[in-house]
From Swiss-Prot:
Top-tier EC class: transferase
Protein's gene: accD
Locations listed in the record: Cytoplasm
Lineage summary: Bacteria, Bacillati, Cyanobacteriota, Cyanophyceae, Synechococcales
Catalytic activity: N(6)-carboxybiotinyl-L-lysyl-[protein] + acetyl-CoA = N(6)-biotinyl-L-lysyl-[protein] + malonyl-CoA
The protein, known as: Acetyl-coenzyme A carboxylase carboxyl transferase subunit beta
Amino acid sequence: MSLIDWFAARRKDQFVGKVSQDTDEGDGLWVKCSECSQVAYRKDLISNFNVCSNCGHHNRINSDERINIIADKNSFKEFDSSLSPTDPLGFKDRRSYADRIKESQAGTGLRDGVITGFCSVNSMPLALAVMDFRFMGGSMGSVVGEKITRIIERATIENYPILIVCASGGARMQEGMLSLMQMAKISGALKKHKEKNLLYMPLLTHPTTGGVTASFAMLGDLILAEPKALIGFAGRRVIEQTLREKLPDNFQTAEYLLEHGFVDVIVKRKDLKTTLTKILKIHGVKELAEANI
C-alpha cells in the first residue's frame, strides 16, 4: 500500500462508521447497513427510526429511543429506577457476575436491562416496559422480572393496557433459579391483569429468545413483532441436531411466526405509534389528561 493509499484509507475510516453486526452502531458520519451493506448518512438513519432506507433492515435501538418512538413527548413517568441487581450466588465464569453488572451499567447508563413506567400514546394511557439488549443481552434476572411484575401490578390497579417491548437472550444464567422463577412471577401478574379484561401487548423485537419467549412474550392478547425479528426458544442449531432435520431458512423469523399463527401483526417501526393508537381505540381506551399520568 502506498503512502497516499494509506492516508486515503485512514481518512475514510474517520467518516464511515465501523458497524458491528451485533450492535449496528458506528463511530463515524456514515453507517454501513449490516444487512445490505448500503452506506447511509448517520443523521438520515436516525431520522428514519434507525431503519435502512434501502432494504428496510431494522437496526437495534436502545430503550430511550424506543420510549421516544412510543410515548407522547414528556409523558413517560419511570418507576423503580433505583432497583439494581446483586450477585446472590457469587457467580463466576471467565469473569465474576458482579464485574459484568458493573461493566454493563457503565456502558449503558442503566441499572439493569429494562425500563418501566406509565406514559400516554396520543393522550391514551399505557403502561410500558422496554427491555434493552445492550445490558447483558437483555437477559432476565431478578431485577428485570421484579420491575416488569411491578409495572403489570400497577397497570392492573389503574386499569391501564400494557405494552412490553421484548429484546432478550432469555433468563440470566448467573442468577440461577432466581432468574427462572421470574417467568412464573410475571405470568402470574399478567393473569390477574387479564382477569380484569385489560389489554396486554408484547412487541417482539430482534432478538426475543429463551425464557422471555417461553413466558410473557407469548401471552399477549395481540402479539406484535418488528420485521425480520429473530423469535424463538432454543437456537436453530440445537433444534436441528435434536430433530435431525434441516429447518426452513426463514425459521424463527417474525414472518414465519406470522404465517404459522404465533404472531398477530408485523409492524414497521415508523408505523408503531399509529398502530398502537388504533389498537387502543378499538379496545375502548379513553384519552387521559396528562396531569393524571
